Amino acid sequence: MDSTTATAELGWIVHPPSGWEEVSGYDENMNTIRTYQVCNVFESSQNNWLRTKFIRRRGAHRIHVEMKFSVRDCSSIPSVPGSCKETFNLYYYEADFDSATKTFPNWMENPWVKVDTIAADESFSQVDLGGRVMKINTEVRSFGPVSRSGFYLAFQDYGGCMSLIAVRVFYRKCPRIIQNGAIFQETLSGAESTSLVAARGSCIANAEEVDVPIKLYCNGDGEWLVPIGRCMCKAGFEAVENGTVCRGKGRSAAGAHWQLGGQAGKGSGLELTARRSVARLSQSSRCSAS
C-alpha cells in the first residue's frame, strides 16, 4: 500500500470527526498528493485517531511501514499550552477480513497493538511556513509476526500540529537466484528482523548435489546468506555462464565441426581440396615406385 499513488480521496476513518482532516498536499518534489493533517494544539486532552483501510498480508510474516510527515515546532506557536506535542503513535490491528466500523475496534491501545511513538528529527516554524520551506521527516518501523489475513494501521495524535504526508506499507523477500549450481525460489523474510529463513535449492539441469543438501538462508532485509552445500555438473558436462548452466563438453566442438564440414551429406570445398591432394599424392607415389 502506498498512499501517494491514490488518484482520489483516501477515505480513511477518523475519530473524532474534529481531529484528522484529509487535504491535498505536496511531497518533497512538490507533487500533489492526498495527506492528513491535525492541529488542535490549543485544546487540551486531545485523542485523535486515523485508521487506514484493510491491508492484506499477502503471506508476509513481518510488515514494514514507511511514514513521511512534518511537525510544527511547539515553541514557534504563540501562547501554545504545555500540552502541545511533537510526536504521534503508530498502532496496528490484525483481522481475517475487513470487519472494522466507525466504532470497532475500540479507539484505544488493546485491542490496538502499539508499534512505537514516532518523533520528528526536524520540525518547522512559522518562518519556514512563510518561506515555504518543507521539512519532511521519514521514519520506518516494522512489526510482526503477523498471521491473519490482513491488518489496519492507526495513527494517534494527542496534541500535535502535524501533517501525515505519505504512508507506504511493504514486506521484504529474497529474490529468485541461481547460486552454487542450484535454483532458489523467491522466499519471504521471517517474522523477526533477526530471522533467518532456510530455503532448499534444486540443482540446475544436468547437475547433482554433492556433500550435504544445498540450502540458503533469507535474512530480515531480504538478502541471501550462509550458503550450505553445492551442486556440480554431472560427468560429461561443464559449468558455463557463471555456473548457471551445465553444458555437454562435446557440444561446442561438434558445432564447430558441423560448420566447417558444411551441410550433412555434402562435402565442403575444404574437404574436396583435401581429397584431391591425397589422390595426387597417391599417384605420385605409384609413379616413383614403378
What are the residue ranges of the model-derived segments?
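Conserved N-terminal submotifs of small, disulfide-stabilized extracellular modules
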Residues: 20-27, 34-42, 107, 112-146, ...
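Leucine-biased recognition of intrinsically disordered, low-complexity hydrophobic segments
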Residues: 260, 270-272, 281
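Short coil-to-beta strand junction motifs in C2/discoidin
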Residues: 78-91
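Basic polycationic patches enriched in arginine
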Residues: 251, 275-276, 280, 286
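Short beta-strands within extracellular/lumenal beta-sheet-rich domains
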Residues: 37-66, 75, 136-141, 164
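Extracellular glycan-recognition surfaces and repeat-rich motifs
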Residues: 1-37
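Short amphipathic, basic-aromatic surface patches that mediate peripheral association
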Residues: 69-80
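Extracellular beta-strand-rich recognition modules
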Residues: 63-69, 149-157
